[in-house]
């Protein structure tokens, strides 16, 4: 929108100045929000990387123990034990809000984790070891999924916030600044013209008074 479309009046000048102040306040708030979002984002990314590395190492250990159990028990026996179990894991989901961003919270219900479907005495100790390690790791895997979703939400909100700041910088602020300058320029020109007009009028009146004597 062109600043020249704004009617150059004192009322509009006052209104534009007030709106300009408000826009600058909004921009500062958005910039503060951006900084806070960046802090949260860095925190969650660091946590994600830490847990990811832990899960990666833990899964390697689980796989190593599992393969040793396969050697001891045979793949057929292992598959029979695995197929005897039903899918019973249950997750509890909720959300929390950070600066207007909905953050998912996911927890594994401990009660839904089935007990070991085999006897530790009759089966390979490596199988029991793989089970225990996998049970511990499952909680972290779910935490990773939660963190990934959180990071995506924060990044999306950060991008929206940055777009608003960019719009203010490149479009809104220039329009209001130019409008204020335009109105002020027109009013100043009018004021100068009025001053010159009054000065000329005063001289004419003075001449007339002089001629009337």
UniProtKB/Swiss-Prot annotation:
UniProt-listed Pfam families: ATP-synt_D (PF01813)
Source organism, top-level taxon: Archaea
GO molecular function: ATP binding; proton-transporting ATP synthase activity, rotational mechanism; proton-transporting ATPase activity, rotational mechanism
BP terms from Gene Ontology: proton motive force-driven plasma membrane ATP synthesis
InterPro entries: V_ATPase_D (IPR002699)
Cellular localization per UniProt: Cell membrane
Membrane topology: Peripheral membrane protein
Key words, A-Z: ATP synthesis, Cell membrane, Hydrogen ion transport, Ion transport, Membrane, Transport
Gene Ontology, cellular component aspect: plasma membrane
Major subcellular location class: membrane
Purpose of the protein: Component of the A-type ATP synthase that produces ATP from ADP in the presence of a proton gradient across the membrane.
Family statement drawn from the similarity comment of this UniProt entry: Belongs to the V-ATPase D subunit family.
Assembly: Has multiple subunits with at least A(3), B(3), C, D, E, F, H, I and proteolipid K(x).
Protein name: A-type ATP synthase subunit D
Species the sequence originates in: Metallosphaera sedula (strain ATCC 51363 / DSM 5348 / JCM 9185 / NBRC 15509 / TH2)
Gene name per UniProt: atpD
